[in-house]
Regions:
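Juxta-kinase regulatory segment immediately upstream of eukaryotic protein kinase catalytic domains
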Residues: 1-23
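An alpha-helical support segment within catalytic cores of ATP-dependent transferases
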Residues: 12-13, 138, 159-208
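ATP-binding pocket architecture of kinase catalytic cores
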Residues: 43-140
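Active-site acidic catalytic loop and adjacent metal/ATP-binding pocket
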Residues: 31-42, 191-238
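A cross-family kinase active-site recognition segment
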Residues: 116-177
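ATP-binding glycine-rich phosphate-binding loop
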Residues: 16-39
Length: 333
Protein backbone atom coordinates (compact mmCIF):
# COMPACT_ATOMS: atom_id res chain seq x y z
CA UNK A 1 0.00 0.00 0.00
CA UNK A 2 1.39 3.40 -0.97
CA UNK A 3 2.10 6.15 1.52
CA UNK A 4 0.17 9.42 1.32
CA UNK A 5 3.31 11.24 0.17
CA UNK A 6 3.62 8.92 -2.82
CA UNK A 7 -0.05 9.36 -3.62
CA UNK A 8 0.23 13.15 -3.45
CA UNK A 9 3.03 13.06 -5.98
CA UNK A 10 0.93 10.97 -8.39
CA UNK A 11 -2.24 13.06 -8.12
CA UNK A 12 -0.28 16.29 -8.53
CA UNK A 13 -0.12 15.37 -12.23
CA UNK A 14 -3.93 15.66 -12.22
CA UNK A 15 -3.83 19.06 -10.52
CA UNK A 16 -5.13 17.58 -7.27
CA UNK A 17 -4.05 17.43 -3.65
CA UNK A 18 -5.22 15.25 -0.76
CA UNK A 19 -5.13 15.33 3.02
CA UNK A 20 -5.67 11.64 3.71
CA UNK A 21 -6.52 8.18 2.41
CA UNK A 22 -10.10 7.71 3.61
CA UNK A 23 -10.57 4.19 2.23
CA UNK A 24 -8.72 1.53 0.26
CA UNK A 25 -10.00 -1.35 -1.89
CA UNK A 26 -7.83 -4.04 -3.44
CA UNK A 27 -9.75 -5.56 -6.37
CA UNK A 28 -6.73 -7.31 -7.89
CA UNK A 29 -7.26 -10.51 -9.87
CA UNK A 30 -3.73 -11.89 -9.57
CA UNK A 31 -0.08 -10.78 -9.47
CA UNK A 32 -0.19 -9.76 -13.13
CA UNK A 33 -3.50 -7.91 -12.78
CA UNK A 34 -3.25 -5.57 -9.82
CA UNK A 35 -6.08 -3.08 -9.17
CA UNK A 36 -5.65 -0.76 -6.19
CA UNK A 37 -8.24 1.89 -5.35
CA UNK A 38 -7.38 4.73 -2.98
CA UNK A 39 -10.26 6.93 -1.82
CA UNK A 40 -8.86 10.39 -1.07
CA UNK A 41 -10.71 12.81 1.22
CA UNK A 42 -13.97 11.21 -0.02
CA UNK A 43 -13.56 13.39 -3.11
CA UNK A 44 -11.49 11.33 -5.54
CA UNK A 45 -10.48 7.74 -6.18
CA UNK A 46 -6.92 7.12 -7.35
CA UNK A 47 -6.86 3.86 -9.29
CA UNK A 48 -3.58 2.09 -9.89
CA UNK A 49 -3.81 -0.82 -12.34
CA UNK A 50 -1.33 -3.16 -13.93
CA UNK A 51 -0.52 -1.91 -17.44
CA UNK A 52 -2.33 -4.83 -19.07
CA UNK A 53 -5.52 -4.18 -17.08
CA UNK A 54 -5.94 -0.53 -18.10
CA UNK A 55 -4.23 1.79 -20.56
CA UNK A 56 -4.51 5.34 -21.90
CA UNK A 57 -6.55 4.67 -25.06
CA UNK A 58 -9.02 2.54 -23.09
CA UNK A 59 -9.46 5.32 -20.54
CA UNK A 60 -10.12 7.86 -23.29
CA UNK A 61 -12.77 5.49 -24.61
CA UNK A 62 -14.35 5.07 -21.17
CA UNK A 63 -14.47 8.84 -20.61
CA UNK A 64 -16.45 9.26 -23.84
CA UNK A 65 -18.79 6.46 -22.78
CA UNK A 66 -19.37 8.03 -19.36
CA UNK A 67 -20.44 11.23 -21.13
CA UNK A 68 -23.02 9.24 -23.11
CA UNK A 69 -24.45 7.64 -19.99
CA UNK A 70 -24.72 11.05 -18.35
CA UNK A 71 -26.50 12.40 -21.42
CA UNK A 72 -29.33 9.86 -20.95
CA UNK A 73 -29.72 10.65 -17.26
CA UNK A 74 -27.50 7.99 -15.68
CA UNK A 75 -25.05 9.55 -13.24
CA UNK A 76 -21.50 8.18 -13.46
CA UNK A 77 -18.44 9.58 -11.65
CA UNK A 78 -16.26 11.16 -14.31
CA UNK A 79 -12.59 10.55 -15.00
CA UNK A 80 -10.32 13.48 -14.21
CA UNK A 81 -7.66 14.33 -16.82
CA UNK A 82 -4.04 15.14 -16.10
CA UNK A 83 -2.74 18.66 -16.49
CA UNK A 84 -1.66 17.81 -20.04
CA UNK A 85 -5.15 16.41 -20.85
CA UNK A 86 -4.16 12.75 -20.79
CA UNK A 87 -6.32 10.37 -18.75
CA UNK A 88 -3.46 8.63 -16.98
CA UNK A 89 0.15 8.66 -15.95
CA UNK A 90 2.56 5.75 -15.56
CA UNK A 91 4.45 4.72 -12.46
CA UNK A 92 7.00 2.03 -11.69
CA UNK A 93 6.11 0.44 -8.37
CA UNK A 94 8.19 -2.43 -7.05
CA UNK A 95 9.80 -2.94 -10.45
CA UNK A 96 6.49 -3.18 -12.34
CA UNK A 97 4.74 -0.64 -14.56
CA UNK A 98 1.31 0.63 -13.54
CA UNK A 99 -1.31 2.90 -15.08
CA UNK A 100 -2.58 5.54 -12.65
CA UNK A 101 -5.85 7.41 -13.17
CA UNK A 102 -8.32 9.37 -11.07
CA UNK A 103 -12.09 9.20 -10.86
CA UNK A 104 -14.54 11.39 -8.99
CA UNK A 105 -15.82 9.87 -5.76
CA UNK A 106 -19.46 8.87 -6.33
CA UNK A 107 -22.01 11.27 -4.85
CA UNK A 108 -24.49 8.40 -4.31
CA UNK A 109 -23.94 5.17 -2.37
CA UNK A 110 -24.07 1.61 -3.63
CA UNK A 111 -27.35 -0.08 -2.78
CA UNK A 112 -27.63 -2.02 0.47
CA UNK A 113 -27.63 -5.79 -0.11
CA UNK A 114 -30.90 -6.13 1.80
CA UNK A 115 -32.80 -3.63 -0.36
CA UNK A 116 -35.26 -5.10 -2.87
CA UNK A 117 -34.63 -2.92 -5.91
CA UNK A 118 -36.77 -2.69 -9.04
CA UNK A 119 -34.73 -4.25 -11.83
CA UNK A 120 -36.88 -2.52 -14.46
CA UNK A 121 -35.76 0.85 -13.10
CA UNK A 122 -32.12 -0.13 -13.62
CA UNK A 123 -32.39 -1.48 -17.18
CA UNK A 124 -34.63 1.19 -18.71
CA UNK A 125 -31.63 3.31 -19.66
CA UNK A 126 -30.40 0.60 -22.06
CA UNK A 127 -33.09 1.53 -24.56
CA UNK A 128 -32.32 5.22 -24.20
CA UNK A 129 -28.62 4.63 -24.72
CA UNK A 130 -29.14 2.41 -27.76
CA UNK A 131 -31.67 4.76 -29.35
CA UNK A 132 -29.21 7.64 -29.15
CA UNK A 133 -25.83 5.99 -29.71
CA UNK A 134 -26.29 2.84 -31.82
CA UNK A 135 -23.29 2.38 -34.14
CA UNK A 136 -21.65 5.53 -32.74
CA UNK A 137 -17.95 5.48 -31.74
CA UNK A 138 -17.91 1.70 -31.28
CA UNK A 139 -15.14 0.24 -29.16
CA UNK A 140 -12.79 -2.46 -30.39
CA UNK A 141 -13.21 -4.00 -26.93
CA UNK A 142 -16.24 -6.29 -26.74
CA UNK A 143 -18.56 -6.51 -23.74
CA UNK A 144 -18.56 -9.49 -21.41
CA UNK A 145 -21.94 -10.63 -22.81
CA UNK A 146 -20.52 -10.89 -26.31
CA UNK A 147 -20.93 -14.09 -28.29
CA UNK A 148 -19.00 -14.97 -31.47
CA UNK A 149 -16.82 -11.88 -30.94
CA UNK A 150 -14.51 -12.39 -27.96
CA UNK A 151 -14.47 -10.22 -24.83
CA UNK A 152 -11.11 -9.42 -23.15
CA UNK A 153 -11.33 -12.32 -20.70
CA UNK A 154 -12.32 -14.87 -23.35
CA UNK A 155 -9.69 -17.32 -24.58
CA UNK A 156 -10.38 -19.01 -27.94
CA UNK A 157 -14.16 -19.26 -27.32
CA UNK A 158 -16.75 -16.84 -25.95
CA UNK A 159 -18.12 -17.27 -22.44
CA UNK A 160 -21.49 -18.67 -23.54
CA UNK A 161 -19.72 -21.41 -25.51
CA UNK A 162 -17.59 -22.17 -22.47
CA UNK A 163 -20.77 -22.37 -20.38
CA UNK A 164 -22.34 -24.71 -22.94
CA UNK A 165 -19.31 -26.98 -22.73
CA UNK A 166 -19.54 -27.01 -18.92
CA UNK A 167 -23.20 -28.00 -19.06
CA UNK A 168 -22.81 -30.75 -21.64
CA UNK A 169 -19.80 -32.16 -19.76
CA UNK A 170 -21.95 -32.34 -16.62
CA UNK A 171 -24.78 -34.03 -18.51
CA UNK A 172 -22.42 -36.67 -19.86
CA UNK A 173 -20.94 -37.30 -16.41
CA UNK A 174 -24.42 -38.20 -15.22
CA UNK A 175 -25.28 -40.40 -18.18
CA UNK A 176 -27.37 -37.94 -20.21
CA UNK A 177 -25.35 -38.38 -23.39
CA UNK A 178 -28.28 -37.97 -25.78
CA UNK A 179 -29.45 -34.80 -24.03
CA UNK A 180 -25.89 -33.42 -24.18
CA UNK A 181 -25.91 -34.04 -27.94
CA UNK A 182 -29.24 -32.21 -28.22
CA UNK A 183 -27.85 -29.24 -26.31
CA UNK A 184 -24.74 -29.11 -28.50
CA UNK A 185 -26.83 -29.38 -31.65
CA UNK A 186 -29.19 -26.60 -30.57
CA UNK A 187 -26.30 -24.33 -29.64
CA UNK A 188 -24.66 -24.88 -33.04
CA UNK A 189 -27.93 -24.19 -34.87
CA UNK A 190 -28.56 -20.98 -32.91
CA UNK A 191 -25.06 -19.70 -33.58
CA UNK A 192 -25.26 -20.45 -37.29
CA UNK A 193 -28.51 -18.50 -37.52
CA UNK A 194 -26.93 -15.56 -35.72
CA UNK A 195 -23.77 -15.67 -37.85
CA UNK A 196 -25.86 -15.27 -41.02
CA UNK A 197 -26.77 -11.70 -40.00
CA UNK A 198 -24.17 -10.98 -37.30
CA UNK A 199 -22.17 -8.34 -39.16
CA UNK A 200 -25.26 -6.22 -39.86
CA UNK A 201 -26.82 -6.21 -36.39
CA UNK A 202 -27.04 -2.81 -34.61
CA UNK A 203 -24.51 -2.36 -31.85
CA UNK A 204 -23.73 0.06 -29.06
CA UNK A 205 -21.11 0.44 -26.32
CA UNK A 206 -22.34 -0.51 -22.84
CA UNK A 207 -21.05 -0.38 -19.27
CA UNK A 208 -21.39 -4.15 -19.47
CA UNK A 209 -21.62 -5.16 -15.81
CA UNK A 210 -24.97 -4.24 -14.28
CA UNK A 211 -25.09 -5.65 -10.76
CA UNK A 212 -25.77 -4.28 -7.30
CA UNK A 213 -22.07 -3.75 -6.54
CA UNK A 214 -21.91 -1.20 -9.38
CA UNK A 215 -25.31 0.48 -9.04
CA UNK A 216 -25.81 3.79 -7.21
CA UNK A 217 -29.01 4.67 -5.38
CA UNK A 218 -30.62 7.56 -3.54
CA UNK A 219 -33.70 7.03 -1.35
CA UNK A 220 -34.18 3.62 -2.93
CA UNK A 221 -34.14 4.93 -6.49
CA UNK A 222 -31.58 4.00 -9.12
CA UNK A 223 -29.34 6.98 -9.90
CA UNK A 224 -26.22 5.78 -11.67
CA UNK A 225 -23.32 3.43 -12.22
CA UNK A 226 -19.67 2.95 -11.37
CA UNK A 227 -17.01 0.62 -12.80
CA UNK A 228 -16.59 0.61 -16.57
CA UNK A 229 -13.81 -1.99 -16.62
CA UNK A 230 -16.08 -4.48 -18.41
CA UNK A 231 -17.51 -1.97 -20.89
CA UNK A 232 -17.46 -2.71 -24.57
CA UNK A 233 -19.33 -3.00 -27.84
CA UNK A 234 -22.12 -5.54 -28.17
CA UNK A 235 -25.14 -6.37 -30.29
CA UNK A 236 -28.06 -4.44 -28.81
CA UNK A 237 -30.53 -7.31 -28.60
CA UNK A 238 -27.92 -9.54 -26.97
CA UNK A 239 -27.42 -7.01 -24.17
CA UNK A 240 -31.17 -6.46 -23.76
CA UNK A 241 -31.81 -10.19 -23.42
CA UNK A 242 -28.91 -10.86 -21.07
CA UNK A 243 -29.94 -8.05 -18.75
CA UNK A 244 -33.59 -9.19 -18.66
CA UNK A 245 -33.12 -12.93 -18.24
CA UNK A 246 -34.73 -14.73 -15.31
CA UNK A 247 -33.76 -18.13 -13.95
CA UNK A 248 -34.94 -19.86 -10.77
CA UNK A 249 -33.07 -19.91 -7.50
CA UNK A 250 -33.04 -23.19 -5.58
CA UNK A 251 -36.32 -22.52 -3.78
CA UNK A 252 -38.15 -21.62 -6.99
CA UNK A 253 -36.68 -24.60 -8.80
CA UNK A 254 -38.04 -26.88 -6.07
CA UNK A 255 -41.44 -25.19 -5.85
CA UNK A 256 -42.30 -24.73 -9.54
CA UNK A 257 -42.92 -27.32 -12.21
CA UNK A 258 -40.74 -27.33 -15.33
CA UNK A 259 -43.61 -25.83 -17.30
CA UNK A 260 -44.08 -23.11 -14.69
CA UNK A 261 -40.36 -22.28 -14.69
CA UNK A 262 -40.30 -21.81 -18.46
CA UNK A 263 -43.52 -19.80 -18.40
CA UNK A 264 -42.15 -17.51 -15.69
CA UNK A 265 -38.85 -17.11 -17.53
CA UNK A 266 -40.68 -15.93 -20.65
CA UNK A 267 -43.07 -13.66 -18.74
CA UNK A 268 -40.38 -12.01 -16.62
CA UNK A 269 -38.21 -11.38 -19.65
CA UNK A 270 -41.06 -10.01 -21.75
CA UNK A 271 -42.04 -7.59 -18.98
CA UNK A 272 -38.51 -6.25 -18.61
CA UNK A 273 -37.90 -6.10 -22.37
CA UNK A 274 -41.01 -3.94 -22.74
CA UNK A 275 -39.39 -1.34 -20.47
CA UNK A 276 -36.27 -1.18 -22.65
CA UNK A 277 -38.30 -1.12 -25.86
CA UNK A 278 -40.26 1.94 -24.75
CA UNK A 279 -37.25 3.86 -25.99
CA UNK A 280 -35.83 1.67 -28.74
CA UNK A 281 -37.46 0.25 -31.86
CA UNK A 282 -36.22 -3.08 -33.15
CA UNK A 283 -35.51 -3.24 -36.87
CA UNK A 284 -36.49 -6.23 -39.02
CA UNK A 285 -33.12 -7.92 -38.64
CA UNK A 286 -33.24 -7.64 -34.86
CA UNK A 287 -36.75 -9.06 -34.74
CA UNK A 288 -35.59 -11.98 -36.89
CA UNK A 289 -32.58 -12.81 -34.73
CA UNK A 290 -34.04 -12.27 -31.25
CA UNK A 291 -35.38 -15.86 -30.84
CA UNK A 292 -31.90 -17.28 -31.43
CA UNK A 293 -30.17 -14.95 -28.99
CA UNK A 294 -32.97 -15.46 -26.47
CA UNK A 295 -32.54 -19.22 -26.40
CA UNK A 296 -28.78 -18.94 -25.86
CA UNK A 297 -29.36 -16.47 -23.03
CA UNK A 298 -32.17 -18.51 -21.43
CA UNK A 299 -29.99 -21.62 -21.15
CA UNK A 300 -26.33 -20.62 -21.10
CA UNK A 301 -25.80 -17.70 -18.72
CA UNK A 302 -22.96 -18.55 -16.35
CA UNK A 303 -24.82 -18.40 -12.99
CA UNK A 304 -27.66 -20.47 -14.44
CA UNK A 305 -25.33 -23.12 -15.83
CA UNK A 306 -23.68 -23.29 -12.40
CA UNK A 307 -27.12 -23.83 -10.85
CA UNK A 308 -27.97 -26.59 -13.31
CA UNK A 309 -24.66 -28.35 -12.70
CA UNK A 310 -25.32 -28.15 -8.95
CA UNK A 311 -28.81 -29.62 -9.43
CA UNK A 312 -27.44 -32.40 -11.64
CA UNK A 313 -25.04 -33.27 -8.83
CA UNK A 314 -27.97 -33.54 -6.40
CA UNK A 315 -29.75 -36.91 -6.35
CA UNK A 316 -33.13 -35.40 -5.51
CA UNK A 317 -32.95 -32.66 -8.15
CA UNK A 318 -31.09 -34.39 -10.98
CA UNK A 319 -34.00 -35.78 -12.97
CA UNK A 320 -36.04 -32.59 -12.75
CA UNK A 321 -33.03 -30.56 -13.88
CA UNK A 322 -32.54 -32.86 -16.86
CA UNK A 323 -36.24 -32.42 -17.70
CA UNK A 324 -35.84 -28.63 -17.53
CA UNK A 325 -32.82 -28.69 -19.83
CA UNK A 326 -34.67 -30.97 -22.25
CA UNK A 327 -37.72 -28.69 -22.23
CA UNK A 328 -35.59 -25.60 -22.85
CA UNK A 329 -33.78 -27.41 -25.65
CA UNK A 330 -36.94 -28.66 -27.37
CA UNK A 331 -39.00 -25.50 -26.89
CA UNK A 332 -40.11 -24.12 -30.30
CA UNK A 333 -38.18 -21.09 -31.50
Amino acid sequence: MLEITEIREIISHFGLSAEAITDFHDTSHNDDDKRWNYVLDNKYVLKINSVGAMWEERLQEIKRLIARYRSVGVYCPDLIPTLNRAMSCSRNIGGKEYTCFVEEFAIYPIIDDEFEHDRKEVIEHLGLLASKYTNVDLSETKSMWSIIDLAPLDIDIDEKQENTNMLTDALRRHGYDLLAQQVDSLNSTLREKIKEVFADLPRCVYQGDLNTTNELYKDGRFMGLIDFNMSGTDVNVNVFLNETNWFPEDEEFDALSVREIISKQDAEQAEKMSVILRHYTLNDLEQYVIPYYKRIVNIFQYPDVCSMIKWLNNDSRREKCACLIKALTEKPL
